[in-house]
Amino acid sequence: MKTPIYLDYAATTPVEFEVAKKMMNYLTIDGVFGNSASRSHKFGWKAEEVVDIARNQISELIGADSREIVFTSGATESNNLAIKGIASFHQNKGKHIVTSKTEHKSVLDTCRYLENKGFTVTYLTPKNNGIIDLNNLKKNIKKDTILVSIMHVNNEIGIIQDINSISQICRNHGVFFHVDATQSVGKIPIDLKKIPIDLMSFSAHKIYGPKGIGGLYVRRKPRVRLLSLIHGGGHERGMRSGTLPVHQIVGMGESFVLAKRKIHDDFIHLTKLKNILWNGIKNIEEVYLNSDLQQGAPHILNVSFNYVEGESLIMALKDLAISSGSACTSASLEPSYVLKSLGIRDELAHSSIRFSIGRFTTEKEIIHAIKLVHKSIHRLRELSPLWEMFKSGVDLNSIEWDHV
């Protein structure tokens, strides 16, 4: 078995061989290397043609019109474009935005940026299982609210939000609805013909495509208007200027084709492996599930092991590539803001591990991972004075610790 075993698919995925092979045809002199904006010769025409094909492939997976797809550098840029673009264009109608405390940093930091520009932002606290309270959402939509931004699947705990119901609430209140679907596109069926979402962000590298390319869905009917962030040649219908990376777009299109073909089998495969993993570790003493198995995505399992530091466990599990949270924030020693928003105390948040599985994960790898987790937890707790006190019956919550 090859080690380390990769269990960090929520951070990024390997590029499918078919995707990489196809991308190579759009890089060199022997292939289609032209600029898709060059309208005066065959090299440009051919590049534009394959970009249009990829745009169609992407739209087919999510039930969109190809003209509603705007290419970006990834989901972070898409989130920025959606939120800042709507806020800038529609600020005369209102300057209030609603989001949640458990959103990705690219949404939260964008909202904080807008607060410094005179906007007000309401950050909803989810229920303990991570789900947004729809009644609370309704109460917080005001006359000057212009945008609600809620992610579909949380990148740390995998909880799935009811974007269908949220979209209806937003439509009834005349408010734009943006969805960060980075962790759901290609894993959970989404049909934008049936769900009235106005803007949706997604990325290629989360579904076995290349890094550095993503998209923003912008609804045409009824038309959604926003101001661009990047100005220049007026590419992407004026919403995102810059020469299109044809090879990356082709790779993204191919990864979306494969996702559409494999989404059902992937879902079954991921659900099976996640259940095996949880069933294999749930009997460890003082283990806590930081999500909801019934309302969670098939590829993410977030667990806390009390009396074990998450960072220490990651170091002990050197044969497993896992995360102590979002890849974008796991370098921080602060406990996960997502888990803290769910009411989880700092000690448990610090002891959390995110396992995220993917298309290439095998049952044999999961079984091996379970054995490694058991072994490492046992060894680390043997070294922990807190664990010894807990096992001796000491109520650690009643102790007043000195902070020097």
From Swiss-Prot:
What is the catalytic activity of this protein? (sulfur carrier)-H + L-cysteine = (sulfur carrier)-SH + L-alanine
Residue numbers binding [2Fe-2S] cluster: C328
Keyword field: 2Fe-2S, Cytoplasm, Iron, Iron-sulfur, Metal-binding, Pyridoxal phosphate, Transferase
Q: Which InterPro entries match?
A: Aminotrans_V_dom, Aminotrans_V_PyrdxlP_BS, Cys_deSase_IscS, Cysteine_dSase, PyrdxlP-dep_Trfase, PyrdxlP-dep_Trfase_major, PyrdxlP-dep_Trfase_small
Annotated Gene Ontology cellular component terms: L-cysteine desulfurase complex
Q: What is its EC number?
A: 2.8.1.7
Residues reported in the UniProt entry to bind pyridoxal 5'-phosphate: A75, T76, N155, Q183, S203, A204, H205, T243
- Tell me where in or outside the cell this protein is found: Cytoplasm
Q: In which pathway does it act?
A: Cofactor biosynthesis; iron-sulfur cluster biosynthesis
Q: Which residues carry this modification: N6-(pyridoxal phosphate)lysine?
A: K206
Q: Name one GO molecular function term.
A: metal ion binding
Pfam families named in the record? Aminotran_5
Catalytic positions are C328
Name the cofactor(s) required for activity, per the record.
pyridoxal 5'-phosphate
Quaternary data = Homodimer. Forms a heterotetramer with IscU, interacts with other sulfur acceptors.
Say which family it is in.
Belongs to the class-V pyridoxal-phosphate-dependent aminotransferase family. NifS/IscS subfamily.
- What biological function has been recorded for the protein in this entry? Master enzyme that delivers sulfur to a number of partners involved in Fe-S cluster assembly, tRNA modification or cofactor biosynthesis. Catalyzes the removal of elemental sulfur atoms from cysteine to produce alanine. Functions as a sulfur delivery protein for Fe-S cluster synthesis onto IscU, an Fe-S scaffold assembly protein, as well as other S acceptor proteins.
Its protein name is Cysteine desulfurase IscS
**Organism whose genome encodes this protein:** Buchnera aphidicola subsp. Acyrthosiphon pisum (strain APS)
Phylogenetic placement of the source organism: Bacteria, Pseudomonadati, Pseudomonadota, Gammaproteobacteria, Enterobacterales
